[in-house]
């Protein structure tokens, strides 16, 4: 299934919102943005620079949403989004990163989702602590790449969708030479584990027709060495953000206004609202709509999947592991495989981050933080029996956190082709942002950013048209004329330490 590209308005008319305000008795158009993740902040910044009155309502006691840089280790550790996918000027976040002088640690120089992502420097071990020969890892990786290529034939042969796991099973039946035995089979399961981590869901739920439809920007993948927090703070600067404001209801009125109700009884009124909460929150119906959203919209929301990935960060007094970017453990099933991101190589701090996705992530959320950290240490001690206990640890729970109820969206098996157009379509003066509505760059920070910009532009157009001044006004876009995206003379700072 081909995913349709996001569209941005062109042929923009001349004029400014200030000129309109003068003609409308200085009535300043107002917009409420629900959610202060990077998508909501991008939407709010865009509208603010267009002279709209913007209020951001955030349920948490912090901004950033699924971007969260923790400093309790004495160094920045991103417990949510941590990569810039597309280390190049193609990335819309590049101007901000460049202007702030932030460093990117490139973990992969290619644009692949699976084949080489994060694997330029790695160490794999079996469950008994034996290191897997790099030649075997490379050989199985090549086989895995071919297996995925063969699934394209399966996809072309059938009109019905199926899971990636089903497609792989058919490929192996047809091509027995691609089957792996013994330790090679366990390495293959590790590659499958890495694929499941990318989508934050098990392979038996990933759509074969859609899994490789995302568009990758050039430049490979880079870790934010100083964390994403500086980027978030820059976009949020001087915006009217109300923390601890959990939205419970959105009401469309007969006079083209919206009333947004907040837990505790406070109401906010505006000309329009942009909703950028995670898709998991929308799927759980934690925000009521009055009148109810139309069926075409609710079915789009319910028809998209939401995955789960959690991080368990461990700080040690010293680094005792090899100087590689990733430490991985192979096993007979992808569920039992695991891997650690080595922040010591990228930042110099003795920190390992265990990453669990899909069913494993959900199961770990059933444990206490201490029990989760103990489980992760058991995995680490299979590789390094003499590993000391961590000095500190951090555990995320994105799947059960009521502010997220999941990590990011994925395409379910049999998803309707018109789901994405319906998902991003506004309902009167209710607009939708967030990473889930970005067809091309779903699940990424820059994808969420672009979705917020797009929603704000659509919102501007709606208000201008309602006021009868569309032909006299131009949209303001962060993509072209914002101070925070002002082109700097220095290049992106890319480190390989």
From Swiss-Prot:
Pfam families, A to Z: Amino_oxidase (PF01593)
SUPFAM superfamilies, A to Z: FAD-linked reductases, C-terminal domain, FAD/NAD(P)-binding domain
Gene Ontology, cellular component aspect: peroxisome
Triggers of expression: By abscisic acid, salicylic acid, wounding and flagellin 22, a pathogen elicitor.
Short sequence motif Microbody targeting signal: positions: 495-497
Cofactor: FAD
GO annotation, biological process: polyamine catabolic process; spermidine catabolic process; spermine catabolic process
GO molecular function, one term: spermine oxidase activity
Effects seen without this gene: No visible phenotype under normal growth conditions.
Binding site for FAD: 58, 66, 247, 435
Cofactor note as given: Binds 1 FAD per subunit.
Principal EC category: oxidoreductase
Free-text function comment from the UniProt entry: Flavoenzyme involved in polyamine back-conversion. Catalyzes the oxidation of the secondary amino group of polyamines, such as spermine and spermidine. Substrate preference is spermine > spermidine. No activity detected when putrescine or N(1)-acetylspermine are used as substrates. Plays an important role in the regulation of polyamine intracellular concentration.
PANTHER family associated with the record: FLAVIN MONOAMINE OXIDASE (PTHR10742), POLYAMINE OXIDASE 4-RELATED (PTHR10742:SF228)
Official protein name in the record: Probable polyamine oxidase 4
The species this protein was found in: Arabidopsis thaliana (Mouse-ear cress)
Gene of this entry: PAO4
């Amino acid at each position: 299934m081909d995913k349709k590209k996001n569209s941005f308005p062109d042929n923009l008319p001349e004029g400014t919102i200030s000129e309109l305000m003068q003609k409308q008795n200085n009535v300043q158009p107002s917009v409420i943005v629900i959610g202060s993740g990077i998508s909501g902040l991008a939407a709010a910044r865009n509208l603010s620079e267009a002279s709209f009155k913007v209020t951001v309502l955030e349920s948490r006691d912090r901004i950033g949403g699924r971007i969260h840089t923790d400093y309790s280790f004495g160094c920045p550790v991103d417990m949510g989004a941590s990569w810039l996918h597309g280390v190049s000027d193609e990335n819309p976040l590049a101007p901000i990163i460049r202007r702030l002088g932030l460093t990117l640690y490139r973990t992969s120089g290619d644009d692949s989702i699976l084949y080489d992502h994060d694997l330029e420097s790695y160490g794999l071990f079996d469950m008994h602590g034996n290191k897997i020969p790099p030649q075997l890892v490379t050989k199985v990786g090549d086989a895995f790449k071919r297996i995925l290529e063969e699934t394209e034939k399966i996809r072309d042969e059938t009109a019905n969708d199926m899971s990636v796991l089903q497609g792989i099973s058919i490929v192996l039946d047809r091509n027995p030479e691609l089957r792996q035995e013994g330790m090679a089979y366990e390495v293959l399961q590790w590659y499958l584990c890495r694929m499941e981590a990318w989508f934050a869901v098990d392979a038996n739920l990933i759509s074969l027709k859609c899994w490789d439809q995302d568009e990758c920007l050039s430049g490979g993948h880079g870790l934010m060495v100083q964390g994403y927090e500086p980027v978030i703070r820059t976009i949020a600067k001087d915006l009217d953000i109300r923390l601890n404001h959990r939205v419970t209801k959105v009401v469309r009125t007969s006079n083209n206004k919206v009333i947004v109700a907040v837990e505790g009884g406070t109401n906010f009124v505006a000309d329009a609202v942009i909703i950028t909460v995670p898709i998991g929150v929308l799927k759980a119906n934690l925000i009521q709509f009055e009148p109810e959203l139309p069926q075409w919209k609710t079915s789009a929301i319910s028809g998209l999947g939401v995955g789960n990935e959690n991080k368990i960060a461990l700080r040690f007094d010293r680094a005792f592991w090899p100087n590689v970017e990733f430490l991985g453990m192979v096993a007979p099933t992808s569920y039992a495989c695991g891997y650690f991101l080595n922040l010591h190589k990228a930042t110099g701090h003795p920190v390992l981050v265990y990453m669990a996705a899909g069913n494993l992530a959900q199961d770990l959320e059933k444990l206490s933080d201490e029990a989760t950290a103990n489980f992760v240490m058991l995995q680490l001690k299979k590789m390094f029996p003499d590993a000391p206990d961590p000095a500190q640890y951090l555990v995320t729970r994105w799947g059960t956190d009521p502010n997220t109820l999941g990590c990011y969206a994925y395409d379910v098996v049999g998803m309707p082709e018109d789901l994405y157009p319906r998902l991003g379509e506004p309902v009167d003066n209710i607009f939708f942002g967030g990473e889930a509505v970005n067809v091309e760059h779903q699940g990424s920070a820059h994808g969420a950013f672009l979705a917020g910009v797009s929603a704000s532009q659509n919102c501007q157009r709606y208000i201008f048209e309602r006021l009868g001044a569309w032909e006299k006004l131009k949209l303001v876009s962060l993509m072209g004329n914002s101070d925070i995206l002002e082109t700097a003379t220095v290049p992106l700072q890319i480190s390989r330490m």
